[in-house]
């Protein structure tokens, strides 16, 4: 609904961060938990550059090694296209003011276009929180993604299934997938 689109969508959660102190022999002395306040919120025009930087740096680190030069260039052209970026909705996972992860969808939230978490924050539940937020705030019964080969296990863990075999378009390798609510 139009009214629903105007409201500010946010979701907060608490995440525990664990630090283990050990002596010189490796014996655990104590465990310290630090609770971090995390928030998912819409990324606006003033924050989009940070989101694109996070996407690009994470892509270069984890996905580009599996792509041809043409594929890397195609992805770069995609994320640098102001016309394309204007058609997408970007949501960020923030710890205070630090952007730790991004999920971007088409306007109707039926298709995931980008889904990245900074390397040092992966495997901490940030991607899951972004996904949960999208799933809860999409009116679509089916959400699709063209997953990179690197991210297939992540999407499977989130409940997506493959809808076809690996495809290649403009040097970009992907596996079409879908999630049914």
Describe the function of each predicted region.
Residues 115-122:
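A short, internal acetyl-CoA/4′-phosphopantetheine-binding micro-motif in the GNAT/acyltransferase core
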Residues 38-53:
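A short beta-loop-alpha structural element at the N-terminal edge
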Residues 149-173:
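Conserved active-site alpha-helix within GNAT-family acetyltransferase domains
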Residues 79-92, 111:
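A short helix-loop-beta-strand connector motif used in the catalytic cores of GNAT acetyltransferases and
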Residues 52, 56-80:
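Conserved GNAT-fold acetyl-CoA-binding loop/helix
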Residues 89-101:
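Conserved beta-hairpin
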Residues 123-136:
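Conserved acetyl-CoA-binding loop-helix of GNAT-fold acetyltransferases
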Residues 137-150:
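Conserved GNAT acetyl-CoA-binding A-motif
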């Amino acid at each position: 609904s139009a009214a629903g689109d105007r409201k500010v969508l946010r979701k907060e959660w608490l995440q525990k961060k664990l630090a283990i102190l050990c002596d010189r022999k490796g014996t655990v002395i104590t465990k310290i938990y630090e609770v971090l306040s995390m928030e998912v919120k819409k990324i606006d025009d003033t924050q989009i550059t940070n989101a694109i930087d996070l996407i690009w740096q994470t892509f270069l680190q984890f996905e580009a090694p599996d792509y041809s030069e043409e594929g890397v260039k195609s992805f770069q052209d995609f994320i640098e296209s102001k016309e394309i970026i204007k058609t997408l909705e970007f949501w960020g996972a923030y710890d205070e003011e630090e952007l730790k992860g991004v999920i971007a969808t088409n306007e109707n939230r039926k298709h995931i276009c980008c889904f990245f978490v900074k390397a040092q924050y992966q495997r901490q539940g940030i991607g899951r929180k972004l996904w949960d937020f999208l799933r809860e705030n999409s009116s679509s019964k089916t959400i699709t993604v063209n997953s990179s080969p690197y991210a297939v296990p992540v999407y499977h863990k989130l409940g997506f299934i493959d809808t076809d075999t690996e495809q290649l378009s403009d040097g970009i390798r992907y596996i079409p997938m879908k999630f049914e609510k």
